[in-house]
């Protein structure tokens, strides 16, 4: 049994705990400092996630952010980041306080940032933050692919790509999280997978917006 720590109780971070638990791992879902009330609400309602509109497995350990440090008393085998792209700076600084060399970090967060007028992937940004805080031997992987949080929670068959410059690392992560409904492929092109995942989301938003604008129920204000 592996110990998996998921930071961020949003839709995808929460949904990701389902295959992790089905693979018989010990999984903790830690809300961010902005999600304390959200975590309390879930615990009071039998792990019911109001966004996903379903109950998460009873084996899942839900915790407020104040318990984050305690999770490192016994080193986790995998840290999963499920915060949005605007929270990467905060998450990187918080992880820096407790991170020890070579714990694998898996990014669910997708997007591109700009630094010095150049594009930067989320993995590059996180690595830069951790290095700025004095950490070395940083181990960051990313996931890309057509996978929806609601589908994953309901165990709809999904296929994703795990990327790391060291492909053996993502193969090891794959063994922790792969199930018969959540299949994983592997790539050593971390930047390529991240860029494609971000661009794919841009197209998805454009298509979604176009469908909404063409809907007969769309108001003139929206159009």
Task: Place the predicted regions along the sequence by residue.
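Conserved active-site and cofactor/substrate-binding residues in soluble primary-metabolism enzymes
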Residues: 7, 11, 15, 37, ...
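Short beta-strand/turn micro-motifs composed of small residues
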Residues: 8, 31, 107-109, 144, ...
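Conserved beta-strand segments of alpha/beta enzyme cores
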Residues: 26, 61-63, 104, 139-141, ...
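Rossmann-like NAD(P)(H) cofactor-binding subdomain of soluble oxidoreductases
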Residues: 65, 73-156
């Amino acid at each position: 049994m592996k110990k998996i720590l998921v930071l961020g109780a949003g839709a995808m971070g929460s949904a990701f705990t389902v295959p992790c638990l089905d693979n018989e791992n010990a999984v903790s879902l830690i809300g961010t400092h902005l999600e304390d009330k959200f975590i309390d609400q879930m615990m009071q309602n039998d792990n019911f996630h109001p966004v996903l509109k379903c109950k998460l497995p009873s084996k899942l350990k839900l915790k407020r952010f104040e318990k984050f440090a305690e999770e490192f008393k016994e080193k986790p085998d995998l840290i999963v980041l499920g915060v949005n792209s605007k929270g990467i700076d905060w998450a990187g600084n918080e992880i820096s306080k407790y991170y020890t060399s070579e714990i694998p970090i898996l990014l669910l967060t997708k997007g591109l940032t700009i630094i010095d007028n150049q594009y930067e992937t989320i993995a590059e940004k996180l690595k830069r933050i951790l290095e700025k805080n004095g950490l070395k031997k940083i181990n960051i992987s990313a996931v890309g692919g057509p996978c929806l949080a609601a589908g994953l929670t309901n165990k709809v068959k999904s296929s994703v790509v795990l990327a790391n410059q060291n492909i053996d690392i993502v193969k090891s992560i794959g063994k922790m999280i792969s199930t018969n409904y959540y299949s994983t492929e592997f790539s050593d092109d971390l930047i390529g997978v991240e860029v494609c995942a971000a661009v794919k989301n841009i197209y998805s938003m454009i298509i979604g917006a176009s469908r909404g604008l063409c809907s007969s129920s769309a108001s003139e204000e929206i159009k």
